[in-house]
Amino acid sequence: MLDYIRKLLESNIEKQAHANTTLLVVGLGNRCITSDSLGPLVVDGLEVDYHIQTGQGRDGRMCAVIPGVMADTGLETADIIRGIAKQVKPSAVIAIDALAARNISRLNTTIQLSDRGINPGSGVGNHRVGINKDNIGVPVLALGVPTVIDAFTIAVDLVSPLLKNCTKEEREEFLSRIYMEGISDMYVTPKAIDTDVQNISGVISEALNQVLHI
């Protein structure tokens, strides 16, 4: 699994930056909430070297930051990252975040990569300013893992096989009744999330370390 992720990262990072350039890794999420702590935990495991200098100048390729959440800082995460990017001038940003799944089978089993950036909080209805090239000023590679799922999605996954003989109208009416119960505001996570998020973050950290320190 580590080798597979490393190859995915290599191919995507090459699109975002040339060799011997600086990359800024951003650990999004709330460290105090286990299911949302993926980003900070990944940054904890990184071998940052941007601060290392030799007689020939700066040799390090990777720097990292954990910007926290708006409830703690009062600031849009995108504004924090943009300010750092203006100072550091990275070739690209790698943003890591926990996601909301749209299928039970993808919980803690899927690592998603995108070169279009990310919108923090959008999976749970807490829309914030997007972290993308337009807002940050440099290309943004987003890396996420689904760690939570809303109760309505679980209900749909479970009852859909039972409704296969119903008409489209009947299915929509049944599902709308479930939705009106308010379960779409409930989010759940696997009971082994503590172990899962530690293992997943370790794999991602090591993959990034291998890619950026070749």
For the regions a language model picked out, list residue spans one by one.
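Extended, charged alpha/beta regions that create polyanion-binding interfaces
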Residues: 1-21
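Conserved active-site and cofactor/substrate-binding residues in soluble primary-metabolism enzymes
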Residues: 3-4, 37, 41, 76-80, ...
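Predominant activation on well-ordered alpha-helical scaffold segments within soluble catalytic domains
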Residues: 6, 10, 40-47, 82, ...
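Short glycine-rich or small-residue beta-strand-to-loop segments that form or flank ligand, phosphate
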Residues: 22-33, 64-68
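Gly/Ser/Thr-rich loops at beta-strand to alpha-helix junctions
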Residues: 28-37, 71, 98-102
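Anionic-ligand anchoring segments at beta-strand to alpha-helix junctions in alpha/beta enzyme folds, i.e.
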Residues: 38-71
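A structural-propensity feature for long, helix-poor, extended segments
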Residues: 58-90
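A structural signal for small-residue-enriched, beta-sheet-centric alpha/beta enzyme cores
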Residues: 65-66, 95-214
